[in-house]
Amino acid sequence: ALKKAKAIYSMFGSFYMSYNSGPTIEPEWNVKCDIDAARKFTSSGANIIYAGLDITAIVKLDKTKRDKLFMRHSPVTDMLEGLYVLWGNETPTLFDPVAIGMVLYPDLFKTKKVHVSIDAIGNTIIDTTKPANAEVGVYINTNEFINRLMKTYMQQNLER
């Protein structure tokens, strides 16, 4: 069924760096929660583009932008403020918006075709000896991405 999609963009994996942007990969949450499902996903034959920690863990919302969002008081920004309080993270990392950003703003990203598999503990392994089965995000124009995201959040005006 996954092969029917033209492309699947997924916040998934740690290919070249970890949560703290260190050079050692580690099991990423979406993978380690269900390693068997992750293995089926990566081997499905679908056209998968991964937004892994390599491009998501570096996208953070600084205090100035956070305060601007929270002063907006729209349904979306109020929800974001609630999540911020719930997670208790001073500078939230925007993991999932990056995967959506890959679809909306492809000009801000660079990807690399690689072969991805999952090891026994949930590491996402790139094997350069095998043919590519996916694309992995390797670059994001972080500043422009955050600017576009902020503009979207600030302009939305859903009814309450």
Where are the predicted features?
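Class I SAM-dependent methyltransferase SAM-binding "motif I" and its flanking Rossmann-like core
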Residues: A1-E26
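Conformational coupling and interaction surfaces
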Residues: W29-D36, T42-R160
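Hydrophobic, well-ordered secondary-structure segments
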Residues: A5-I8, D34, A38
